[in-house]
């Protein structure tokens, strides 16, 4: 639904008022305190002061006011407004809970540039530092202006928003950690507020969820005890907490995987957990072959690099069934017939998903070779291929499925929940046969 001008104008005015109110109130409250510290690196004293950079610094106001008018749908406008609102409120809370001020004296500047500095510094104070709300907002704005421009205009837009980011340092408005915090805040807001959120089915595994939750709680205790630089542990702590929620029932949708790829906001938000998954893949890939043939036209294997995927395509793979939620698919595989049914690691597919997997494998194996994979090519892949073997009649029982899979892929590990799902499917297939 197109955005009415009045709606865009209301959003622009409302967001501007929210920013001015929260930012100004936090500045004023902090100015009344005597316990305001600083946070910076020693080498930041050598960052030059560049007066002309006040122009890109102040230009963000114009882009901010104009952004809602670029939105082409109510959903896009609502998502933008939610991100900006959340960033302002979260940043405001941080300004009050962890007040900081700029550590250095800001040089006096003459001429018309000096007049600009005098004007905006008359309304500003050296507080509201971490996270940099200026950085968070320019990240939202940069994304929306890039979406609605192209060619040389987009290049100019991206360049200007890069200058806005740099200007926060070169005008002595922020320290380096403020910028890191601002980008982090923007990443969390991008991750949390999506235009299209899909609820994916999940079979919960509370035991794994508790492991992640315990890890998050341990990090929280460390942060509360040691403070200061231990706040950096918020990153893995939040990551563990979100993944714990996935295993308790939120499901694989936490990875936001779309068209076979994880967005950058997921890489940031869940980075520590994704790093753990990557290290796990590197370890297990030494324990097994890349892929094995289970039946004519059906291969089972692990997540492949783009080079390995290209080799598989040259070897005859024409379709891919990707069961991972936590990895981006290789470009070579996304270029052929690609289907993603995201299943959380260490969980089993639902019965509906097993039927969907079996149907895809059956259809694609008649046209060429279908490559079925999860992270390592073990339990999730075994469930998918097992569903196909049972549904097609190539195996008469779950025990036959297990025997065949272990014969062709000796290192395979099939988790109890995957076996239980296959047994449930087998019962349903038998009942369907008897009733027909």
Name these PLM-found stretches.
Residues 67-75, 144-149, 189-197, 224-226, ...:
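Structural signal for the C-terminal ends of transmembrane alpha-helices
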Residues 27-45, 70-165, 190, 320, ...:
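Membrane-interface loops
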Residues 113-120, 282-372, 376, 387-430:
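Cysteine-based protein phosphatase catalytic domain of the PTP/DSP
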Residues 197-282, 289, 311, 358-369, ...:
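PTP/DSP superfamily signal
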Residues 3-7, 69-81, 147-152, 199-204, ...:
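Membrane-interface helix-boundary motifs at transmembrane edges
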Residues 118-206, 390-393, 399-409:
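Membrane-embedded catalytic cores of phosphoryl/pyrophosphoryl-handling enzymes
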Residues 1-63, 106-108, 117, 249-262, ...:
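N-terminal transmembrane-helix/juxtamembrane module of multi-pass inner/ER membrane proteins
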Residues 20-21, 89-96, 159-171, 216-223, ...:
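Aromatic-anchored segments of alpha-helical transmembrane domains
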């Amino acid at each position: 639904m197109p955005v009415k001008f009045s709606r865009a104008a209301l959003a622009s005015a409302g967001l501007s008022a929210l920013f001015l109110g929260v930012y100004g109130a936090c500045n004023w409250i902090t100015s009344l305190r005597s316990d305001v510290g600083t946070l910076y690196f020693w080498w930041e004293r050598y960052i030059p002061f560049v007066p002309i950079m006040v122009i890109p610094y102040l230009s963000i106001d114009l882009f901010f006011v104009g952004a809602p008018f670029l939105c082409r749908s109510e959903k896009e406008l609502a998502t933008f407004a939610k991100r900006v609102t959340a960033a302002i409120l979260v940043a405001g809370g941080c300004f009050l809970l962890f007040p900081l001020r700029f550590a250095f004296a800001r040089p006096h500047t003459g001429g018309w540039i000096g007049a600009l500095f005098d004007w905006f510094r008359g309304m500003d104070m050296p507080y509201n530092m971490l996270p940099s709300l200026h950085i968070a907002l320019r990240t939202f704005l940069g994304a929306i202006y890039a979406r609605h421009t192209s060619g040389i205009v987009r290049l100019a837009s991206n360049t200007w928003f890069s200058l806005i980011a740099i200007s926060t340092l070169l005008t002595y408005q922020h320290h380096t950690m403020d910028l890191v915090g601002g980008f982090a805040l923007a990443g969390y807001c991008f991750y949390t507020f999506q235009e299209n959120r899909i609820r994916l089915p999940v079979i919960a595994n509370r035991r794994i969820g508790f492991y992640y939750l315990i890890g998050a709680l341990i990090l929280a205790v460390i942060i509360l005890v040691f403070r200061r630089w231990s706040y950096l542990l918020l990153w893995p702590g939040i990551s563990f907490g979100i993944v714990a929620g996935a295993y308790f029932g939120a499901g694989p949708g936490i990875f936001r995987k779309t068209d076979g790829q994880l967005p950058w906001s997921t890489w940031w938000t869940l980075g520590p957990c994704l790093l753990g998954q990557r290290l796990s893949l590197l370890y297990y890939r030494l324990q097994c072959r890349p892929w094995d043939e289970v039946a004519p036209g059906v291969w089972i294997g692990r997540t492949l690099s783009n080079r390995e995927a290209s080799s598989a395509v040259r070897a005859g793979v024409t379709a891919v069934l990707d069961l991972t939620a936590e990895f981006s698919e290789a470009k070579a595989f996304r270029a052929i017939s690609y289907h993603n049914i995201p299943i959380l690691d260490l969980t089993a597919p639902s019965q509906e998903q097993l039927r969907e997997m079996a149907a895809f494998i059956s259809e694609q194996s008649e046209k060429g070779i279908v490559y079925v994979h999860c992270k390592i090519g073990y339990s999730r892949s075994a469930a998918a291929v097992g569903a196909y073997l049972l549904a097609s009649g190539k195996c008469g029982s779950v025990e036959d499925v297990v025997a065949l899979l272990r014969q062709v892929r000796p290192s395979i590990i099939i988790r109890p929940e995957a076996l239980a799902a296959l047994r449930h499917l087998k019962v349903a297939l038998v009942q369907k046969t008897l009733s027909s």
